[in-house]
């Protein structure tokens, strides 16, 4: 691993994998949260969206990889979309369920103080759903890394998944183990960053 870091080779593959993970999170998390909140608070939205999620969510996301490759090509697009499907489904379910679980008297009490729809979302719904959302994001992050490894072994020339399989096929076990360690450290770094963001976003839980 140290040798790969020194010559910069493994850094290129770490960068490729990290780029795909971050793009998938940035593209999937905001709409998943927004639509999940809508489904949790608006009956019509739940009626329209929940059956679709019930149909698609149980399917193994890797089953969509051939379809995504046909539609988006063999580049980053199909890999990012595959991870995005993983993130979207889990965050949508978490946001919807946590929004539905908010006690109506809590919302009514805030509304009685003159708080309008945006204020209710800002001060009640969003904070109440954030803990579940971050927990789901933590789970989906691990699943996304596993899916990333699989997707990078198909028609790819970079990324830690490709590097691991390439080293294995060349019987270069030191490089293979170095790439596996790099993938584990990448996941650890992302989890630590998520923990730090959780502490910042949920500081109100420590009050009192």
What is each of the regions a protein language model found here?
Residues 1-26:
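Periplasmic/extracellular loop-to-transmembrane helix junction in inner-membrane transport proteins
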Residues 54-90, 97-98:
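Generic hydrophobic transmembrane alpha-helix motif, especially the helices
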Residues 23-53:
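Transmembrane-helix boundary motif in ABC transporter permease subunits
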Residues 94-139, 160, 164:
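Short cytoplasmic-facing helical segments at TM-TM junctions of multi-pass membrane proteins
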Residues 81-85, 117-150, 178, 182-183, ...:
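Transmembrane alpha-helices
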């Amino acid at each position: 691993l140290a040798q790969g870091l020194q010559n910069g080779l493994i850094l290129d593959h770490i960068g490729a994998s990290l780029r795909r993970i971050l793009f998938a999170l940035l593209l999937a998390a905001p709409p998943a949260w927004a639509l999940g909140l809508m489904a949790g608070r608006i009956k019509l939205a739940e009626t329209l969206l929940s059956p679709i999620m019930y149909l698609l969510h149980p399917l193994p996301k890797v089953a969509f990889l051939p379809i995504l490759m046909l539609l988006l090509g063999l580049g980053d697009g199909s890999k990012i979309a595959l991870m995005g499907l993983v993130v979207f489904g889990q965050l949508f379910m978490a946001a919807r369920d946590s929004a539905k679980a908010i006690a109506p008297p809590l919302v009514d009490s805030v509304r009685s103080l003159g708080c309008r729809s945006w204020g209710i979302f800002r001060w009640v719904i969003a904070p109440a759903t954030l803990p579940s959302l971050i927990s789901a994001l933590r789970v989906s992050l691990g699943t996304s890394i596993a899916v990333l490894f699989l997707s990078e072994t198909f028609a790819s020339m970079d990324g830690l998944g490709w590097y691991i399989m390439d080293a294995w096929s060349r019987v270069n076990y030191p490089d293979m183990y170095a790439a596996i360690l790099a993938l584990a450290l990448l996941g650890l770094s992302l989890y630590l960053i998520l923990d730090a963001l959780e502490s910042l976003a949920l500081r109100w839980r420590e009050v009192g």
